[in-house]
Amino acid sequence: MSPAAIAEAHGDPYVAAIRAVSNGSSSYMNGGAVQGMKRTTFLFDRHLHKDFPVIVRGSGSNLYTKDGRVIFDATSGAAVSCLGHGNKRVTNAVYQQMASGIPYLASGFFGNETVDDLCEELINGTGRKMARVYLTGSGSEAMEATCKLARQYFYEKDKSTPRVNFITREGSYHGNTLGALGMSGHKARRAPYTPFLMPNVHHVSSCNPYRQRLPNESDALFVSRKAAELEAKFQELGPETVIGFCVEPIVGAALGCVAALPGYLKAMRDICHRHGALFILDEVMCGMGRTGTLHAWQSENVAPDLQTIGKGLGGGYQPIAGVLISQKVVNVLYNGTGQFIHGQTYQGMPVQAAAALEVQRIIRQHNVLDNVRIQGAYLGKLLKQHLADHPHVGDIRGKGLFWGIEFVKDKKSKMAFDTKLSVAQRIHDTAISHPYNMTMYPGTGTVDGMCGDHIMLSPNYLVTKEDVEYIVRTAVDVIESVLENL
């Protein structure tokens, strides 16, 4: 995208910040207030021993701290802020909806045109491959709703249905609520809560060529082996007992941007449909444009029966996620009880819909996904160019503006670092501190759900070529600094 196009997409005379690293001319490179300023808070933070930078405002890719630093947001938070921070069009849309006097409506009582317009925008974005949208407040809520909807689909058809089992994958993450966590295959996240998790969720291996490909095994043979494994799991459980198979097309937080190989999604869907089960995609993190198509499945045109969406849906301007529902699922409920036995207070709020609708309109009207593909390819190219030969970089993978780097103690054996070293967390902590001042998303459990380290880079969709070069230059400096001092 040209600078003018970027400015227009931001809704104001925004000019992408020039990251003047080489000559040290930027104020954030020349010091500023003392870091580590103690923060007094009664918030029960997720990390009780950390003193986080206090952010006071944001603009584009920049976050401004209370102590005078400027932090470049190279991860869009958790791959959320897809249009960057402070977008005038989106904030104005939210303001207008608030000013209407109806930021909230009880979704069980009333309809709303803003909500309807958003749902139409989303269904059109699937090429009408999906039929309806169920809106929620978070990705975890969306997965909870998906599990219940999938079960109700079969219950409506036959109240004595034996379909009670889900199949998901090892090394997956589908959310933090008990149902969503039960669907996940990330051992470390599950461990404290195992006694409470659904017992009827069964796992097959992930699709991770870096760690699972056999010697001389082609992509086609690899996919065939994975298909055989899923088929075997259906047979083990009894095909008539399986509700569905749930998969992330590109695994985000749990594995660090590991994409399914070409043909994998179709092979998995074919098995599900052969046995009358539902094919379910979790695109909360990898979807809504993050990988260069609005939905990750569109790159191979493998539409699901149910799909979760979130994060980039509202771009961080409101908490919103949802479930895209195929016509066959809609038909069963429509011709049955006529209702979905589920609901939460803050779902489908007009103010949430206003934010998401404006985000999606900007993406469509300004062909923003062209920039995702162009800058994403450049980001991947530069990462591989500068880090592929590093002795402790095992793999660099990703698509669009969604890239992961996996770290290893030994490149040949692919042995992970000792978990006590907290490699990914060290990289994050170093990156976000002066003089680097950039976010890098840390992840652990990359190898087996317990050990292994990776980081992710997922900048906003409006980044420039110069931004990408700055991201890679900074990431390389941080990684080299941390790894050489372990």
Task: Annotate each predicted stretch with a short phrase.
Residues 2-486:
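Conserved N-terminal phosphate-binding loop of PLP-dependent enzymes in the Aspartate aminotransferase
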